[in-house]
From Swiss-Prot:
Organism: Candida albicans (strain SC5314 / ATCC MYA-2876) (Yeast)
Localization per record: Nucleus
Assembly information from the UniProt record: Component of the SWR1 chromatin-remodeling complex and of the NuA4 histone acetyltransferase complex.
Keyword Cell cycle found: no
Annotated protein name in UniProt: SWR1-complex protein 4
InterPro entries in the cross-refs: DAMP1_SANT-like, DMAP1, Homeodomain-like_sf, SANT/Myb, Swc4/Dmap1
Major subcellular site: nucleus
Length: 635
């Protein structure tokens, strides 16, 4: 027995405060399922978060009984099947909420007139002009025919003008062809005459050469001379006999050539005439076929335009019934010869006339109806059919052509950009003086002479300066752009002058020319330079500034303002980019023109940017602290 059991038997109560604490049963750290399996991993974490996801065993049985009582108290509303007639000759039924007597009472208004159908507001119809009687229709058709006849006359006039232009062009072409043929016929005759002249000149030159040779020969022996004379006589006789033969043969050949050329030209002219005749025949045939087709079209239009009163009335009824849905109207129209375009044209023509004769006519609507053109609509449909009937190869070819066109456009744009850039680079500075006087040879010679005279004067001045060393040397003139308002310390200038004067005294030369140069330098150093002269000569006194030994470019100089951390330099670079100030990046930042003034200003700018960033950082920190304190205090 335990101590508690003994105390219960003896009816002795124990103070709970003095009792030792009960030992708690140790629960396993890992949860277990009812099957005894332990949960691990993700399932264990979900179990610890959600707990055992088991539905309660006890069901509330009162909910069903409460709902049942509510259902008993609820009374269903009555629904009645009522007839209605949306159109004449049709009677339909639908369910309406409420009793029959109440609905019948609500169907009539206080005056006793029946109320309109509730869903009648959704029955929207197009506003089509009312069709006119037969007399007005006939008047409208007469006006339409007169207007169309005028339009046809204008078209015929334009076609005639076009044909006349074509005929004129053909006649001009024929005249040009005939002129070319005549020129081609004249050219061979001129060539023959030129050949004859060339041959005559050649023969004359040959005769002269032979005579000169015969005169130049020495007469040594009389026998030889006599023999030669005899031979010459014989040769002359032979030549005289042969000349007419050759001339006759030449004339015969020339006549045959002329006859052949004339025959060929006649054949060519006959061929061209035959071709022209064939072309004229084909053109006349084409024109005849065109005239026949135009006449057929006109006859078709005349037959199509003959609309009766009954047909148009039926057309308006169909348009009103089917709300201008033209495929359905064309399908329901009794005349199969009428196309959808014919129906549209007739409907729009009559509507235009009706609207024009109204008192309050809408001009914008009339203009929109007049914009319809039947031949244009037929062409549009034909183009659309051709587009839809394209093969895949044709589509791919068109796409490739579009891509090539775009490439050409891009290449043209690039070329224009490059051309403009080159023009800007090659653009020469505009001269203030007139250059036309130096374009001629006389102007160039004058310019050359002037330059020579100027050079001589300069040499004379130099010789005079050397001969007069006692004159005070004059420094070169200072440009206006070199002036500035910056003040500098003048103590360094005096120190420099003292140092150079002592240096020149130590290095004393015996050469008189060197002495003259030293004297001029001493005089320049003894003279006190002004601020403008210092800027013009580029003199600068560093003072307490430390300089590295050796030669150094100013563009390679490291600015003292750049001795910052890398993060600060990045933020400085971002800010300079926002201000559109060019930088080289990294630690070698420098302006485009690194002069002394620009480098100094650039260093000041970087230092001011660094201080500005520090101030901004401190400001942001203070603002965040203020917001935090306000949120803590609930302000």
């Amino acid at each position: 027995m335990s101590a508690n059991d003994i105390l219960d038997v003896l009816n002795i109560q124990r103070d709970e405060s003095n009792q030792p604490p009960k030992k708690k049963q140790k629960s396993s750290s890992t949860p277990t399922l009812p099957d005894g399996k332990q949960l691990t991993g993700m399932a264990r974490e979900l179990y610890n978060l959600v707990g055992p996801n088991t539905p309660p065993i006890n069901l509330n049985s009162n909910s069903y009984t409460a709902n049942k009582e509510k259902m008993k108290k609820f009374k269903p509303s009555p629904w009645t099947r009522m007839p209605f007639t949306p159109k004449q000759g049709i009677e339909l039924n639908h369910w309406v909420k409420g009793s029959k007597e109440l609905i019948e009472q609500q169907e009539f208004e206080e005056d006793g007139t029946p109320k309109p159908y509730f869903f009648e507001k959704y029955n929207v119809q197009l506003e089509i002009p009312e069709f006119v009687d037969e007399d007005t229709y006939d008047l409208y058709m007469i006006e339409i025919k007169e207007y169309e006849s005028k339009m046809k006359e204008e078209r015929a006039r334009r076609e005639k003008e076009r044909k006349e232009r074509e005929k004129r062009d053909l006649e001009e072409k024929k005249k040009k062809q005939q002129q070319q043929q005549q020129k081609s016929q004249q050219n061979p005759q001129n060539q023959i005459k030129d050949d004859e002249k060339n041959q005559d000149t050649r023969n004359n030159t040959d005769k002269k050469d032979s005579e000169q040779k015969s005169e130049d020969k020495p007469t040594v022996e009389a026998k030889k001379e006599t023999d030669e004379k005899k031979d010459d006589v014989v040769l002359k006789d032979n030549t005289n006999e042969t000349k007419p033969v050759t001339e006759t043969t030449k004339s015969e050949t020339e006549t045959t050539e002329q006859n052949n050329s004339e025959k060929t030209n006649e054949n060519e002219t006959n061929k061209t005439n035959d071709k022209d005749g064939e072309g004229n025949l084909t053109k006349s045939k084409d024109s005849a076929t065109e005239d026949q087709s135009n006449n057929k079209k006109e006859n078709d239009e005349d037959t199509e335009s003959e609309w009766t009163y009954k047909e148009t009335k039926h057309l308006f009824e169909l348009c009103q019934a089917f709300e201008l849905k033209w495929p359905i109207i064309h399908d329901r129209f009794p005349n199969p010869n009428r196309t959808a375009e014919d129906l549209k044209e007739q409907f729009y023509r009559i509507c235009i006339k009706i609207l024009e004769n109204q008192k309050n006519k809408n001009q914008a609507l009339i203009d929109s109806l007049k914009a319809y053109c039947k031949p244009r609509e037929l062409e549009r449909k034909q183009y659309l059919e051709n587009l839809l009937k394209r093969t895949p190869a044709e589509i791919a070819e068109e796409e490739s052509l579009v891509i090539e066109a775009r490439r050409f456009e891009i290449a043209a744009k690039k070329m224009l950009m490059e051309r403009s850039n080159l023009l800007t680079l090659l653009d020469s500075p505009q001269t203030t003086q007139n250059v036309s006087q130096y374009q001629s040879s006389q102007g160039i010679t004058n310019l050359y002479n002037n330059l020579l005279i100027y050079d001589k004067h300069q040499k004379k001045k130099q010789m005079a300066n050397k001969s007069n060393p006692q004159q005070e040397p004059v420094p070169p003139p200072i440009p206006l752009a070199a002036s500035s308002s910056v003040k500098r310390d003048r103590g360094f200038q005096t120190q420099l002058q003292q140092y150079l004067s002592s240096f020149l005294k130590q290095n004393h030369h015996t050469n008189p020319a060197v002495k003259q140069e030293i004297n001029s330098i001493q005089q320049l150093l003894m003279k006190r330079l002004t601020q403008k002269e210092e800027e013009a000569y580029g003199l600068y006194f560093h003072g307490t500034e430390k300089l590295n030994p050796g030669v150094m470019l100013r563009s390679q100089q490291k600015l003292p303002g750049l001795n910052q951390r890398q993060s600060i330099l990045k933020s400085v670079n971002i800010l300079l980019q926002e201000m559109d100030i060019p930088t080289g990046g990294g630690t070698s930042w420098k302006p485009i023109m690194p002069t002394r003034k620009t480098m100094a200003k650039y260093d000041e700018l970087i230092r001011s940017v660094v201080t500005l960033l520090d101030v901004k950082k401190a400001k942001d920190k203070l603002e965040s602290e203020i917001k935090l304190i306000k949120s803590q205090r609930g302000l």
